[in-house]
């Protein structure tokens, strides 16, 4: 059994760690609330864009934009959004597992795969993974702006325009609630059709004046908005996962302190008993 002094030092060390994890939990909770506000504010725009584009994909246009045409899948691109920092449980690991599983399915069909990682952890993973990285972005902070992503996203759009990609997906952790964050893979290009069949079959848009000019701008903005929404969703998910992970670490530290305190008390009691035995033995010898 370790000595009482050694155990006491370990208890002090664990208490210091507990203070750090508790502080990180509170910081993550505060950041999560702000991230949730940004996510909630941007969701209606992203969802409205998705509905509009879904109707466009269903509509019968004289001008058929390249983003509406379904090509044979020979090359697939993934924009993978992960966190810049760790200490957020299995958030990034679960996301990467989902991507790798999807990539294996494509490669089994002889399809080439390229990546655009967003977030330091994503960049680090896919460079080690050995995939072809077309573009990347990291260090976006807790309150990223759309302008921070446009350059990176347009590299992938350019590759799609040039026929170097036939499918484009965005991957991120969707924020469900504080305890649940779900990794999702959403198709960006070619444009997915609206799932709302009832509305799609009852009306269509009238384009004035030239649908080409409008769609060229609208469809690019759509892709950018969906990637941005994925980033803000992932930030909210990251902070929620970190808050939960730090709470678990704080609770575990408390349990460890209690266990160490019990060991310390036993060691101290054993030391006192040993001293008393030595005193009694010495007195008997005299």
Curated annotation (Swiss-Prot):
Listed under subunit, the entry gives: F-type ATPases have 2 components, CF(1) - the catalytic core - and CF(0) - the membrane proton channel. CF(1) has five subunits: alpha(3), beta(3), gamma(1), delta(1), epsilon(1). CF(0) has three main subunits: a, b and c.
Give an example GO cellular component term for this record. Answer: plasma membrane
Output the superkingdom of the source species: Bacteria
Pfam families linked to this entry:
ATP-synt
Function of this protein? Produces ATP from ADP in the presence of a proton gradient across the membrane. The gamma chain is believed to be important in regulating ATPase activity and the flow of protons through the CF(0) complex.
Q: Give the matching InterPro entries.
A: ATP_synth_F1_ATPase_gsu (IPR035968), ATP_synth_F1_gsu (IPR000131), ATP_synth_F1_gsu_CS (IPR023632)
Q: What is any one GO biological process for this UniProt entry?
A: proton motive force-driven plasma membrane ATP synthesis
Similarity comment text for this entry:
Belongs to the ATPase gamma chain family.
- Cite the Gene3D superfamilies for this sequence: 3.40.1380.10, ATP synthase, gamma subunit, helix hairpin domain
For whether the record's keyword set contains Membrane, the answer is yes
Q: Which UniProt keywords apply?
A: ATP synthesis, Cell inner membrane, Cell membrane, CF(1), Hydrogen ion transport, Ion transport, Membrane, Transport
What this protein is called in its record is ATP synthase gamma chain
* Localization (cell): Cell inner membrane
Q: Name one GO molecular function term.
A: ATP binding
Membrane topology is: Peripheral membrane protein
Claim: Glycoprotein is one of the keywords in the record = no
Q: What is the lineage of its organism?
A: Bacteria, Pseudomonadati, Pseudomonadota, Gammaproteobacteria, Alteromonadales
């Amino acid at each position: 059994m370790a000595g009482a002094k050694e155990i006491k030092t370990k208890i002090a060390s664990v208490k210091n760690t507990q203070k750090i994890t508790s502080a990180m939990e509170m910081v993550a909770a505060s950041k999560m609330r702000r991230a949730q506000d940004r996510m909630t504010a941007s969701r209606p725009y992203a969802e409205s864009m998705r509905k509009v584009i879904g109707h466009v994909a269903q509509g019968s246009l004289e001008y058929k934009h390249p983003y509406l045409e379904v090509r044979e899948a020979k090359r697939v691109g993934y924009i993978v959004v992960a966190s810049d920092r760790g200490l957020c449980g299995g958030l990034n690991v679960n996301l990467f597992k989902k991507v790798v599983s999807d990539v294996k399915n494509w490669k089994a069909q002889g399809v080439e795969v390229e990546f655009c990682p967003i977030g330091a952890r994503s960049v680090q993973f896919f460079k080690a993974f050995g995939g072809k990285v077309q573009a990347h972005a990291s260090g976006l902070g807790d309150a990223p702006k759309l302008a921070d992503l446009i350059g990176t996203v347009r590299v992938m759009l350019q590759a799609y325009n040039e026929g170097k990609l036939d499918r484009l997906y965005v991957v991120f952790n969707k924020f469900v609630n504080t305890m649940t964050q779900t990794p999702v893979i959403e198709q960006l290009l070619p444009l997915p059709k609206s799932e709302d069949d009832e509305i799609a079959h009852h009306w269509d848009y009238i384009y004035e004046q030239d649908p080409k000019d409008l769609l060229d701008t609208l469809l690019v903005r759509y892709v950018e908005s969906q990637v941005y929404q994925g980033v803000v969703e992932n930030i909210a998910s990251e902070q929620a996962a970190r808050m939960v992970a730090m709470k678990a670490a704080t609770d575990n530290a408390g349990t460890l302190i209690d266990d160490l305190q019990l060991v310390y008390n036993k060691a101290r009691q054993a030391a006192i008993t040993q001293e008393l035995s030595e005193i009694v033995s010495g007195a008997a010898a005299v």
